[in-house]
Amino acid sequence: MTDTSHLRSIREQVVQRHIAAEEDGDVAAVLRTFAPGRVSYSGDTLGGDLIGDHAVGAMLTAGLAAMSDLKIEILRLHHAEDAVITELRLASTHTADFDGIPATGRRVTYHMCAVFRFDGADLWQEAVYYDIATIKAQLTG
């Protein structure tokens, strides 16, 4: 196995552990997939960058409470020089306040692009891109 393919394998395993922990609702396990002291989430729908265990953990806790029984399907995965880029399909049940919308009990499905940024084998940021209007339409329609 070449150095490049070995590094890609390690990164892909980190991404898979990260996604599995999100599906399990295990915020501590999600945070452990990041390099120590380098926890960061980015995305316009998050209101800007979130940096550190506390900020990211609070966002994940609220998000996983609002959208329970989360299922994430990796549709595509691409390796870049310093990132793993994923196209995902997410499905969950709206069980608590989400962006000002009280729990509806509705099942929602949407697509997301998640870019997992690495320094070598160390994950230091996840940047997420999704259409919040698609989610809101399913919750209010």
List each language-model region with its residue ranges.
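C-terminal and inter-domain tail/linker signature
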Residues: 1-141
